[in-house]
Amino acid sequence: MRLLAGAGLCLALAALALLAVALSTDHWYETDARRHRDRCRKPGGKRNDPGYMYTPGQHLPLRGEPPSSRIRSPRGGEPGGVRMISRAEDLGVRGLRERPTGARDLPLSRPYLATDPHCSRRFNSTVSGLWRKCHRDGFDKDTEELILKGIVERCTSVRYYYTSSSLPPNLSVNVTKTIRQDEWHALHLRRMTAGFIGMAVSIILFGWMVGVLGCCKQHDLMQYVAGLLFLMGGTCCIISLCTCVAGINFELSRYPRSIYSLPEEISHGYGWSMFCAWGGLGLTLLSGFLCTLAPSLSASQSAVHKPRQENGAV
């Protein structure tokens, strides 16, 4: 039926529009680091969310004393050669133990608890797509000032070729080799994502042209071929989107976690560009189903309405 074929072609055109929007925008994956940045700017940088507990200071590992202090006999009740790290000693107050006899005893300070190690790293609020990764507008005033001064670029292009990134010099050889292998794996996932979604758009566009010609010439076989092409394009789109999700999960679980993992305060998730791509996938599969169903319905109706020949008729 021409109505089903026309509806399938309209859905395929809408799917092409959604896929084009997804390809041309950068909101596939979004991160929001404002809550993490605000927490790290507070004094101490400690988390106060329910259910999170810091390790008490008395359970922290002990630090050995310098060799000069180990020669002296240990005090009573304290093992020789070890001492607790106190805030007074961190501030350089070394004369507490050699105070005069008549001096007033000072209260001992509590062991110093280090801040969150994630606060030593800078996390930005970003949006990323297939081609670019950009800083989100209005999420960080310091970054906005650097962008206005030209020190930091608003967007950086996503690389589809291998480049060795700079790594900390204190990493072991095995860790460095693992990071290099993970970079190759992430690069292959990005290439598969871009390649398969490009194939999907090309196949859907070609199928739409074949379907339009089939509707104009009332050729059922061309409409059937167009439906098969739509289903093939939807399959390529499924592979592309699944590979994109796998690539994002792989980036978040890379080793070592101290370099590639995100703190819990940073909210991250998929953006509206990803949902446009999934919507285009659904419309593509639906259009393929309608275009392959229309020729079979028209063939069955023509067989039912075919006039019966009388006996002796040629």
UniProtKB/Swiss-Prot annotation:
- Region Disordered: what ranges? 32-83
Q: Where is the composition biased (Basic residues)?
A: 36-45
Sorted keywords for this record are: Membrane, Signal, Transmembrane, Transmembrane helix
Compartment(s): Membrane
One family from Pfam that matches here is Claudin_2
The signal peptide stretch is: 1-24
Q: Which residue spans traverse the membrane?
A: 194-214, 228-248, 274-294
Q: What is its main location?
A: membrane
InterPro entries, A to Z: PMP22/EMP/MP20/Claudin, T178A/B
| PANTHER family, per database record | SI:CH211-150G13.3-RELATED, TRANSMEMBRANE PROTEIN 178B-RELATED
Q: Belongs to which family?
A: Belongs to the TMEM178 family.
Name of the protein this chain belongs to: Transmembrane protein 178B
Organism source for this protein?
Answer: Xenopus tropicalis
